[in-house]
Amino acid sequence: MTQGRQKDELKDITLLGNQNNTYEFDYRPEVLETFDNKHQGRDYFVKFNCPEFTSLCPITGQPDFATIYISYIPNIKMVESKSLKLYLFSFRNHGDFHEDCMNIIMNDLINLMDPHYIEVWGKFTPRGGISIDPYTNYGRPDTKYEKMAEHRLMNHDMYPEKIDNR
């Protein structure tokens, strides 16, 4: 029989269930929290769908809106979802290009969790008649995940969806 999480396993989770959280508008990677992966002997994907991402254009200061998809194969640590929500919210006043935001998010999550594999895909709403959908991924070097990352990158978005203003 599988047991649930014990209190000592949750000691580093401070944001989930906390009604006194503040929503910071400036980039704050330190808000991210992790917990242990109890299934380290198994490969599996964890996917976050984040439909309310907002950042700022670094030139005009205009807001950019996106749905972000974060998928990863955990190793030892996993990101706690409320901390991820607060982290993504912290991009609200962050001025950067779409491509930079996706790579920053991926790099922060790699530094936090050291996953086997991770990919971050942003689907931004159009501005000026053009939507931008940056995709970035990473597979642990010298492992099957490195080959997986290369394969997924080379085959990414081969059949783009019909865009009807998102």
UniProtKB/Swiss-Prot annotation:
Cystine bridges: which residues? none
Q: Give the Gene Ontology MF terms in alphabetical order.
A: preQ1 synthase activity
Q: Which InterPro entries match?
A: GTP-CH-I_C/QueF (IPR043133), NADPH_dep_7-cyano-7-deazaG_red (IPR050084), QueF (IPR029500), QueF_type1 (IPR016856)
As given in the record, the signal peptide range reads: none
What UniProt keywords apply to this chain's record, in alphabetical order?
Cytoplasm, NADP, Oxidoreductase, Queuosine biosynthesis
**Protein's UniProt keywords contain Amino-acid biosynthesis:** no
EC code? 1.7.1.13
Biological pathway: tRNA modification; tRNA-queuosine biosynthesis
Which Gene3D superfamilies does the record cross-reference, listed alphabetically? 3.30.1130.10
Biological process GO terms, please?
A: queuosine biosynthetic process; tRNA modification
Family listed: Belongs to the GTP cyclohydrolase I family. QueF type 1 subfamily.
Question: What is the role of this chain?
Answer: Catalyzes the NADPH-dependent reduction of 7-cyano-7-deazaguanine (preQ0) to 7-aminomethyl-7-deazaguanine (preQ1).
Under which name does UniProt file this protein?
Answer: NADPH-dependent 7-cyano-7-deazaguanine reductase
Q: Which classification does the entry list for the species? A: Bacteria, Bacillati, Bacillota, Bacilli, Bacillales
